[in-house]
Amino acid sequence: MPITPQQALQRTIEHREIFHDEMVDLMRQIMRGEVSDAMVSAILTGLRVKKETIGEIAGAATVMREFSRRVEVTDRCHMVDIVGTGGDGSHTFNISTCAMFVAAAGGAKVAKHGNRSVSSKSGSADALEALGAVIELQPEQVAASLAQTGIGFMYAPVHHPAMKVVAPVRREMGVRTIFNILGPLTNPACSPNILMGVFHPDLVGIQARVLQELGAERALVVWGRDGMDELSLGAGTLVGELRDGQVHEYEVHPEDFGIAMSASRNLKVADAAESRAMLLQVLDNVPGPALDIVALNAGAALYVAGVADSIADGIVRARQVLADGSARACLDAYVAFTQQATAQG
């Protein structure tokens, strides 16, 4: 028998787990709009207070994928998503968005799932719009973009229409809930590989094991000790790596890759315009901390995508495509594609 919302709430109050199959039933009820706003809010709060388990997160992610508008891709070789949970409060420029162009130029196919701002002054969607890209592409247009440019950006509201059901509740609550954790797990192109930044150290191991349960091939889940949801220059970075079906947790430092440490305040921006300017400086290969952190994260993406044999090798490849202009050319090609695709209807 499916679990009722009342039973689920009682479980959270008692700090007991909602088992995987029960979570699947519960999330289907929520996504179909069968659970009241008051009850949704109570359950989300209860889950947050007791702390979501691997089974609960995996069950909820399974349903979100089920309700999404998929991007059909035939060749997933070297495909990777570069994504963060947001919520780290760092207000940096769009590091993962910039790394997307570098990784694509380096030989990965980047199927990036993103939205508007959460923790930065400019989310991935905001940044791409500031660069001239059209973000609200339909699934078949995203698939074509991925095939032609090596990049497919999936704007979350287009691909997760069922999320409209819980949007008012989330907005009114104004706090992190399980949905902040679910976004990076629900890539509509079903990318088998992922570089994921998280906002809390506990999530490094949890999200890596959720991805393991969801059938991901390879993953790097990262949290910088300075609070960044990226591989950081300002401190060590905790890493949960999924490879060959096993999860290994370890720590890396910028010095491990011959990169100088630099505080995250050197990467801060005030708005989308400043973020755009810094992103373009990186793609034009202007030396500095911004270039270094993008090379580091793009290198990690190339490693997890299977293009590079190690993060260090990936960084070398990233610096090559930044230096020879390939990364900037990748941005220009992607923006042109989105504009043309929209003009053609």
UniProtKB/Swiss-Prot annotation:
Binding site for anthranilate 2: R170
Chain's role: Catalyzes the transfer of the phosphoribosyl group of 5-phosphorylribose-1-pyrophosphate (PRPP) to anthranilate to yield N-(5'-phosphoribosyl)-anthranilate (PRA).
Lineage: Bacteria, Pseudomonadati, Pseudomonadota, Gammaproteobacteria, Lysobacterales
Name of the protein described by the UniProt record: Anthranilate phosphoribosyltransferase
Binding site for 5-phospho-alpha-D-ribose 1-diphosphate: 84, 87-88, 92, 94-97, 112-120, 124
Pfam family, one: Glycos_trans_3N
Name of the gene this protein is made from: trpD
Entries under Gene3D superfamilies matching the protein: Nucleoside phosphorylase/phosphoribosyltransferase catalytic domain, Transferase, Pyrimidine Nucleoside Phosphorylase, Chain C
Catalytic activity: N-(5-phospho-beta-D-ribosyl)anthranilate + diphosphate = 5-phospho-alpha-D-ribose 1-diphosphate + anthranilate
Cofactor note: Binds 2 magnesium ions per monomer.
Family the UniProt entry places it in: Belongs to the anthranilate phosphoribosyltransferase family.
A single GO cellular-component term on record: cytosol
Binding site for anthranilate 1: G84, N115
Keywords: Amino-acid biosynthesis, Aromatic amino acid biosynthesis, Glycosyltransferase, Magnesium, Metal-binding, Transferase, Tryptophan biosynthesis
Cofactor names: Mg(2+)
Domain of life: Bacteria
One Gene Ontology term of the molecular function aspect: magnesium ion binding
Annotated positions binding Mg(2+) 2: D229, E230
Keyword Phosphoprotein: no
SUPFAM superfamilies named in the record: Nucleoside phosphorylase/phosphoribosyltransferase catalytic domain (SSF52418), Nucleoside phosphorylase/phosphoribosyltransferase N-terminal domain (SSF47648)
EC number(s) recorded for this UniProt protein: 2.4.2.18
Pathway assigned to this chain's UniProt record: Amino-acid biosynthesis; L-tryptophan biosynthesis; L-tryptophan from chorismate: step 2/5
Organism: Xanthomonas campestris pv. campestris (strain B100)
Keyword Repeat in record: no
EC top class named in words: transferase
InterPro entries for this protein: Anthranilate_Pribosyl_Tfrase, Glycosyl_Trfase_fam3, Glycosyl_Trfase_fam3_N_dom, Glycosyl_Trfase_fam3_N_dom_sf, Nuc_phospho_transferase
Chain positions recorded as Mg(2+) 1 binding sites: S96, E230
